[in-house]
């Protein structure tokens, strides 16, 4: 695959993370770009179509469409799966 694209929301989420978490997320984004199905897990129910990768207490939420990975949000696990825009 290729480097994941980030939505405006995901870029903003990334900028607000603590430095150590941001570094771990960037490493995970590299892995997602290589093997997105292996790094994350497919979500079900109302979040069907999204994938989620764990990074400590944070979750990287993304979609895989036509070989392109689009990161939609990077949120703390307590709020990652709540209704809202992903």
Feature map (PLM): residue ranges:
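Hydrophobic "lid"/C-terminal helical patch
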Residues: 29
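Short proline/glycine- and basic residue-enriched helix-capping loop/turn segments at helix->loop/beta transitions
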Residues: 32-37
């Amino acid at each position: 695959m290729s480097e994941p694209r980030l939505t405006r929301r995901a870029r903003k989420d990334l900028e607000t993370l603590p430095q150590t978490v941001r570094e771990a997320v960037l490493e995970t984004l590299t892995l997602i770009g290589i093997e997105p199905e292996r790094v994350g897990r497919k979500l079900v129910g109302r979040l069907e179509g999204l994938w989620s990768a764990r990074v400590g207490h944070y979750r990287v939420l993304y979609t895989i469409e036509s070989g392109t990975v689009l990161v939609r949000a990077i949120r703390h696990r307590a709020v990652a799966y709540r209704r809202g825009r992903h």
